[in-house]
Amino acid sequence: MVQKAEIKLWSTNVESLNQVVEQIKAIAKKTGVRMRGPIPLPTRRLIVPTLKLPHGEGSKKWDKWELRIHKRLVILDADERVIRQIMRVRVPEDVYIEIRLR
């Protein structure tokens, strides 16, 4: 039975996230490893309402600030040389990666 590697990526910047996913896809294609994904997972929206007026008197006016966290899942056959190449991929500061072997 072949071991699988689940690579979960998340970021607030969708362009840099897709860039890292494309690098992983290129590695999988170059080495001939079977790959599933990238599977887009649900985007998490964090909304923070803040009161515009500092003293709280008068009519209540609110600002809403939103942060979106985009997620992707890639599943690969866990070959040792492929995992080493993925570990060498340049990852921007705003992209987070979690690799789980199954």
From Swiss-Prot:
A cellular-component GO term for this protein: small ribosomal subunit
The entry's keywords: Ribonucleoprotein, Ribosomal protein
Pfam assignment, any one: Ribosomal_S10
Molecular-function annotations in GO: structural constituent of ribosome; tRNA binding
GO BP field: translation
TM segment ranges: none
PROSITE patterns the record matches: RIBOSOMAL_S10
Assembly information from the UniProt record: Part of the 30S ribosomal subunit.
Family statement drawn from the similarity comment of this UniProt entry: Belongs to the universal ribosomal protein uS10 family.
Summary of the function given for this chain in its UniProt record: Involved in the binding of tRNA to the ribosomes.
NCBIfam families attached to this UniProt entry: uS10_euk_arch
Protein name: Small ribosomal subunit protein uS10
Protein source organism: Hyperthermus butylicus (strain DSM 5456 / JCM 9403 / PLM1-5)
Gene name in the database record: rps10
